[in-house]
Amino acid sequence: MDDKASVGKISVSSDSVSTLNSEDFVLVSRQGDETPSTNNGSDDEKTGLKIVGNGSEQQLQKELADVLMDPPMDDQPGEKELVKRSQLDGEGDGPLSNQLSASSTINPVPLVGLQKPEMSLPVKPGQGDSEASSPFTPVADEDSVVFSKLTYLGCASVNAPRSEVEALRMMSILRSQCQISLDVTLSVPNVSEGIVRLLDPQTNTEIANYPIYKILFCVRGHDGTPESDCFAFTESHYNAELFRIHVFRCEIQEAVSRILYSFATAFRRSAKQTPLSATAAPQTPDSDIFTFSVSLEIKEDDGKGYFSAVPKDKDRQCFKLRQGIDKKIVIYVQQTTNKELAIERCFGLLLSPGKDVRNSDMHLLDLESMGKSSDGKSYVITGSWNPKSPHFQVVNEETPKDKVLFMTTAVDLVITEVQEPVRFLLETKVRVCSPNERLFWPFSKRSTTENFFLKLKQIKQRERKNNTDTLYEVVCLESESERERRKTTASPSVRLPQSGSQSSVIPSPPEDDEEEDNDEPLLSGSGDVSKECAEKILETWGELLSKWHLNLNVRPKQLSSLVRNGVPEALRGEVWQLLAGCHNNDHLVEKYRILITKESPQDSAITRDINRTFPAHDYFKDTGGDGQDSLYKICKAYSVYDEEIGYCQGQSFLAAVLLLHMPEEQAFSVLVKIMFDYGLRELFKQNFEDLHCKFYQLERLMQEYIPDLYNHFLDISLEAHMYASQWFLTLFTAKFPLYMVFHIIDLLLCEGISVIFNVALGLLKTSKDDLLLTDFEGALKFFRVQLPKRYRSEENAKKLMELACNMKISQKKLKKYEKEYHTMREQQAQQEDPIERFERENRRLQEANMRLEQENDDLAHELVTSKIALRKDLDNAEEKADALNKELLMTKQKLIDAEEEKRRLEEESAQLKEMCRRELDKAESEIKKNSSIIGDYKQICSQLSERLEKQQTANKVEIEKIRQKVDDCERCREFFNKEGRVKGISSTKEVLDEDTDEEKETLKNQLREMELELAQTKLQLVEAECKIQDLEHHLGLALNEVQAAKKTWFNRTLSSIKTATGVQGKETC
């Protein structure tokens, strides 16, 4: 980590981090017991939070060095504040109390740099609070590590906040039941006084925050389980008995260990103000210096499946990168002096564009490998770098030939015998070129090396936790370049401000000393402009605008004096339009709406410049954002509107300044006024002839106002066009801070384009002493880098504008210089030898001819290449046409065959229909015949049954009569008993039996004949059913053929036949 604070160490095997309970991470207060608790959470008394003074808030406040109090929570009444303390190990200054931010619904977020606004947290009144407890005011730029590509899975209440089993169980439940995952960015502070923040990845706004001292336990999912890419932490809520667990999932699984390590670091470290001393710490007997040689190598995809080292420019000492090509970062770490220290692992490889970047601006790269080299002398770390990521857009755009970019690479190493991780920071220069550019210049070595001096202090035996713990702690870490810079800064030749003295002239900015060797120019669009203004000034401007609106054609008298002090930011949009005379610009507004619909011939140049316009301003830095879209429309509309000039490089800066104060239509109108009415477009005409006249006027003014600087520029052959071109063409809008740019535009719109001379002379006059000490290269570098940085202080910019306004440069004098220039040009033309002129013209024409020939060759080559490509495409198209023709013929033949098959199937279908009709009619007739036969037999049977019943009844009646007659006869009565049975005479009985048997036999014969006829009828019915089955079989075969022909109507007909046949068959049964 960096030098500002120290960090703790976490074991590789550790899956969880707890502020009070972990074998790898036990935090002990200096006031507490020196023997840390090592239980695993089974004993509540040992793992509970210990509060000084037995829980008394007053006693706790007296013990605390810094107190964090909860702000009032109006939206969550009834929840109480929980103030407990962690017990910090060794380095902590004491226990810390904390606040919990209220968040009922958390919207998770991925990781970008967090810039924390300066704020003061009010003290929440409570019982026992005393006046001695002051609120904690966080630092404006909180030192933190930001992690992106995280997903928030949710939170839940837990009863055992330090139980790893409970935490893993809740992690599994939330991961499996999560239906709506939310992307978040997590910011983890580097000190225990900090706050963990959840940020929105799009707007970078804070969603929720959790103070470190409220976080009780951290845990990650076990390897080999679905939760291996998840981690969680528990925090105490407002009620002392309420604990919540928050679960997150990482898109990059390796980042889980890095996040847990950041939490462990925050638990260990106290926010001590330990800036790096300007002088090295004195050598003590118990300290040692270890020297490390760290080399950086960048590799690019060579298109053949391998990565090759990128070249390094021998003169500029910068890497040359190709745009949009995948890269790898390779770091070689080798210890060169002192006792060898064992590097355990690398837990972070980070990269960021720029120089002197903050920790929160560094972006984590994916680690591919780490370990000892083949010879065992160095430790090698390799990481993959995707340059197309939005974070690295600055180092993925083509760099102008005269510029270089800075890039910062950091590697975090865990050294076995060192208590804290060590961060080696490498700042290198890079240039980005086209992906198709060939590398043709000679190169030196393809890596850059920096020596680092790590000063360690051995920890005393009694301060260690055990015998196997770390042996050293970091005192300071310094690179060789920092040492050289410090020596240069402290040398007597460098002018340092005397203590206690304050100069009235514009002082050198305080950052000049530390950025003297910084070759990176100030980004355009930098500098915050405040809209605050004194009430008296606003009242004065309000009265002036009221009078002005009464007559817009006449400017108020006091306008010039007010503009010289600067127009209030809130009024600039309106005042600029009035100064430019755009109060009647309806025709330009309508014209603009038409122009943006037309095509511009300079579209590519506009698009290229827009990406470079105000990259430091939030409104324009997003590619494809609203700011760049509006800026593109304005530049495109003007290029179509002014066909003679079109779009010229630098116009986008002026358009961006206007766009920051007014809508697109009004900004376009003011831009047109500045270009035409103020004469800015004249500078671009006639091969920049008027611009060269301005350069001559500036040099003549320098000769009059700053003669010594003018003579110095003559001595070093520095001409005005070498440093002032951008001043005139962009009106100082390209490089200087915005508050200074806006003030210059105020003066320009009020007094005209001659204001440029006032500002230019002011810049030269205030920088005269520095410029007199420079040579040609140094002067150019000063104008490009140091000069804009001098005015990052708004006070310096105001003094410069006061100086510029006080300079009296009359128009008469400028006219005089203009005449001198034209006279000089005429004299040069007259005095010039015609032969020399013709030779120069001849050389120019030859160069133009060579250029045209080269262009012709290029076009011819492109034409040949295009013809070859077109011939190849034509051959491919012809082959494809032949194949399609063959396929068409085959398809046509298949269609003819299919039509013939269709006709054949239709004929067969008609025959089947006819056969089905015949068989159906025959079956119906058979069924009717069988039905009539069955009905006749049923009728006969019923008649016979009736006849039998009648005969039986008659027989019974006759028998009864005979019985009565016998009863009446005295002789016959003896032959019968009381039941009517014959007593004795067997012959009579036999006769009667014979008569009865004959009658029965007759009936049986008749019944047998009827049964035989019935059996014959059933046999005929069975034969009819067999025939029906045969018909159904034939119908089934026909059905298959019909189905093949996809005749669905035939299926319905056949089904109706089956249904009818089946119903009638059941009736016959």
Swiss-Prot record:
Residues 798-1047 form a coiled coil. Keywords: Cell cycle, Coiled coil, Cytoplasm, Cytoskeleton, GTPase activation, Phosphoprotein. SUPFAM superfamilies: PH domain-like (SSF50729), Ypt/Rab-GAP domain of gyp1p (SSF47923). The keyword Cell cycle applies. It is found in: Cytoplasm, Cytosol; Cytoplasm, Cytoskeleton, Microtubule organizing center, Centrosome. Pfam families: DUF3694, PID, RabGAP-TBC. GO terms for molecular function: GTPase activator activity; small GTPase binding; tubulin binding. The record marks 608 as: Arginine finger. The modification Phosphoserine is found at residues 42, 360. Residues 1-79, 482-527 are annotated as: Disordered. The keyword Cytoplasm applies. The record marks 649 as: Glutamine finger. Residues 7-22 have a biased composition (Low complexity). Residues 142-298 form the PID domain. Residues 566-752 form the Rab-GAP TBC domain. InterPro entries: Kinesin-like (IPR022164), PH-like_dom_sf (IPR011993), PTB/PI_dom (IPR006020), Rab-GAP-TBC_dom (IPR000195), Rab-GAP_TBC_sf (IPR035969), Rab_GAP_TBC_domain (IPR050302). The modification Phosphothreonine is found at residue 996. May act as a GTPase-activating protein of RAB6A. May play a role in microtubule nucleation by centrosome. May participate in a RAB6A-mediated pathway involved in the metaphase-anaphase transition. The arginine and glutamine fingers are critical for the GTPase-activating mechanism, they pull out Rab's 'switch 2' glutamine and insert in Rab's active site. Interacts with RAB6A and tubulin gamma. This is Rab GTPase-activating protein 1. It comes from Homo sapiens.
